[in-house]
Amino acid sequence: MPGVPDNAAGLRAANARLRELLAERDAEIAVLREQNSEIAVLREALAALQSQVADLAAQVKKNSRNSSRPPSSDGLAKPAPKSLRGKSGRKPGRPKGQPGVTMELTDHPDKKVRHRPAKCGCCGKSLKGAEVTAVERRQVIDIPQVRAKITEHQMLTLLCGCGCETKAAAPDGVTAPVQYGPRLMGTGIYLWHGQFLSRDRACRALSEMFGRAPSPGALAAAARKAAGLLAPALKAITEYLVSAEVVHFDETGFRTAGKLAWVHSASWGKFVLVTVHAKRGKDGMTAAGILPFFRGIAVHDAWKPYDTFENVAGHALCGAHVLRELVAVTETGTDLDRAWAQQAIDALLALDKAAEDARAAGGTAISPDLLAEHEGWYRKAAETGIALNAGRTGKLQEKRHALAKRMKDREDDYLRYARDLRVPFTNNAAEQAIRMSKLRIKISGCMRSMTGAEEFCAIRSYLATAARHGIGALDALTSAFQGRPWIPETG
């Protein structure tokens, strides 16, 4: 048979050759297996790198509009403004028919200065004694130079006919041979804790404006005194908030004595209370004195320690926070992710508008059919988000899954504003209440001691509440230093 060896030697040679071929094949198979193993490792590494790149890209895209970052972190390249509410149809500028704010001439100026031309503009003759035919009025609003005045109180000692000497009592608050008065000290505290100048700069400003100024140490002592004088006002604010039906709560970092402390805020309507504590969580919230005794609806973000207060009637989660999270999904997710996130955004905003319209019309509830429709869209969006990100491969999917699951699990809290018109859609009021503490840090740096931070928060609570009641900060502080702090009515 052709090709078949005709002897044993030929068979052995062919067999040896086959063994060589089999060995080569086994070696190639081993190499391929090793390569497959390496490819699998490389694929895993590539997937991990792709996930990291996606996470980093999402981080780069984060700004104050789609995350919890403050607007100050946007830098010079601020994101283009976008309104989730869509176009209102209103043109920019002052609405037609609305009165303007042009300064008007007053009929009762404090001072009048008449300017007469000396000679005729045509023939050059003197105009002395000439008849006045017209008057053009122009007014300049300015402030006169203000210098501190020194008032000396002399307590006389009088001798009675019976031989007894009686000395007059000093006026209230006049306790030292030389001291600064309530308006000067009130102005100093206003510049320091009202306008956030540093303590030294506040003293320099007083000196330059009024010719007199306390030392930085004396101003610090005045702040300590003011915080003590404000105790009755702070007590009234606390009592009002504890008994309120709805209260906003928030917290933010506040660098103090080289460490991170936390400012906690509670506010509703015209009342604001800010406190400071070393802890952000339940300890700090408890020390503020509102949440442990509160029986109303607490409006806040999804920070878990708020949920540990079971004495409250209910929780309402901030709509602005969840909108920012959903906007981030629309900007970084897949087409399917964008769809469910946008659906949730539309449902939340539609319910917010319906709630606003109902309040404006004097109603107490949204139309049941409208409420049910948008609740359904919201619910379906959350369920879709959970299903699409069930694999949770990578941080982005984990975040989207967590967001959708939270929306589903806490539907009652996210939609409470639509079911109870007393509840606002956002927690912006609480953020506004603590914004001044961040502004203070930006302008004049951190607080040097926890005691100083506590004094700052006490004064800010007083000033913020006074401002919401139409009371000027300077007047409120002056009254406090006169021993008559303004106390809000809570009835």
Give residue ranges: language-model regions.
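Short, flexible loop/hinge motifs at secondary-structure junctions
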Residues: 1-179, 249, 300
